[in-house]
Amino acid sequence: PTITIGGPEYRTIFFDAYLGTSYVIVIKEPAEEFTTISDAVK
């Protein structure tokens, strides 16, 4: 899955060992709508 958050693009990938899923996180600054990546993933 891809999660997009907030201004200019910054991309990182992490692996959820529990679900066996790779997430592509696109973080944009400023990102006022979330507090943590975990919140964004939910």
From Swiss-Prot:
Keywords: Allergen. It comes from the Eukaryota. This is Pollen allergen Sal k 1.
